[in-house]
Design a protein with these regions (language model features):
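Active-site beta->alpha N-cap acidic-glycine motif
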Residues: 2-113, 202, 209, 218
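Catalytic domains of cell-wall/extracellular-matrix polysaccharide-remodeling enzymes
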Residues: 39, 84-182, 186-204, 208-209, ...
Length: 224
């Protein structure tokens, strides 16, 4: 008899989890790499969790970008500079923000990212041109953009407490079958790093299926 058990694809795992009434959760971290990235990767390793990192170009932390890939997480794009004025100034400036980062990450890791997250999300109010202008370029490059439907709230100017971040994430996840959770991996987001173990432990206690974004992941988009 064939004793080899076929590995389920992510989409099969998701269908099975949802049929069983379990939650499906994608943990995503924007704005890295940073001084916190290595600690965050260690926490994820500790729990056997794979996440998704939407990164910007930060040459001083090149090593961590490589680590994201070698440790089996999904490396994705968040723009080269994260400077709203430049990212959204024109079609050409947006194209440059995507191309420079894509080429940079490919050279660094050998992996060409397929996923992008708009700074501020696709519903941001910082763009003078319609967001569809920029989406059209991503479509041409076969790059998929991902927003989020659960926010940790850690992206504002005020640093939230570990409890606030934890509560924001868990209450958001509890209200949805499939959650794409927005968090930030920047060095002044220390409490996000500290909240991550508690968030993972609670999700595991809930028997949630925690996955990285892959090319098969159905994108969550804000209503444009």
């Amino acid at each position: 008899t064939d004793s080899v058990v076929k590995e389920l694809s992510d989409s099969e795992k998701i269908d099975k989890a949802l049929a069983e009434g379990r939650k499906v959760v994608y943990l995503t971290y924007d704005d890295g790499p940073s001084a916190n990235t290595e600690k965050l990767l260690d926490v994820l390793d500790q729990y056997g969790i794979k996440a998704t990192f939407f990164v910007i170009k930060t040459p001083e932390y090149d090593e961590y970008v490589k680590e994201i890939v070698t440790r089996g997480h999904t490396l994705a794009m968040h723009s080269t500079t994260h400077d709203y004025r430049h990212v959204y100034e024109s079609y050409d400036s947006f194209k440059e923000e995507v191309d420079v980062l894509s080429n940079y990450l490919t050279e660094l890791t050998g992996f060409t990212p397929f996923a992008f997250r708009f700074p501020g999300g696709s519903s941001n109010q910082q763009t003078t041109l319609p967001i569809q202008t920029f989406i059209k370029y991503l479509d041409e490059k076969n790059i998929v953009y991902y927003d989020w439907n659960v926010s940790s709230g850690d992206g504002g100017s005020k640093e939230l407490t570990v409890d606030e971040i934890y509560n924001n994430v868990i209450s958001g996840v509890e209200g949805k079958d499939i959650s794409v959770v927005l968090m930030h991996d920047s060095e002044y987001r220390e409490t996000t790093l500290q909240a991550t173990p508690r968030i993972i432990e609670k999700l595991q206690e809930m028997d949630a299926l925690i996955l990285p974004i892959t090319e098969d992941t159905v994108p969550v988009h804000h209503n444009i």
